[in-house]
Amino acid sequence: NEGGKEELESIPGLVPTEEVVYAPLYRNPKRIFGIGLNYADHAKDIGNAAPTGFPGSFFKMADTLIGPNDDILLPKLKEAQKTTAEAELGIIMGRDCRDVPEEEWESAIVGYTTILDMTEESILKGNDFVPGNPRYLTIVKNFPTFFSFGPQLVTPDEVPDVLKLEVQSVHN
């Protein structure tokens, strides 16, 4: 649309892009549910095989939520020796999705977003202070600020084939 950018820039009270502070898409979600060890190669990283049947899973607490460019606070525990970050595709559910037929899975999705999921990996794998255990998955993912969520919400109609998306993290 011709002239669109100029019209947008002339809106009174418009905040300049460089002054915009992005926040997480949602501050108090009912549930944050994560799937873990779903990549065979990553499961090997922590000395496990990828689960068969149901995937490994964990919950995130609301105090883990931060927006992009917010600081990630590293745990100050002596057991916490290696914090890692993984870029993930976040799937935002718009309704309860229990007992949804497999062929209708997309009907429960409102959209997708980017996530940076932090893990205190040394506790999960084990170190001089604590033996490793995959049951620690929820603990090692729930330190405050360990879940950067958003800021964009991409609706399903904007993604021709979600299974063809690639997600990667790049350290700046």
Residue ranges of each PLM-predicted region?
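N-terminal non-catalytic cap/leader segment that marks the start of a structured domain
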Residues: N1-G56, D157-P160, Q168
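Catalytic-pocket segment enriched in acidic/His residues
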Residues: E6, S10-E19, H42, P75, ...
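Structural signature of FAD isoalloxazine-binding scaffolds in flavoprotein oxidoreductases
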Residues: A49-P68, A85
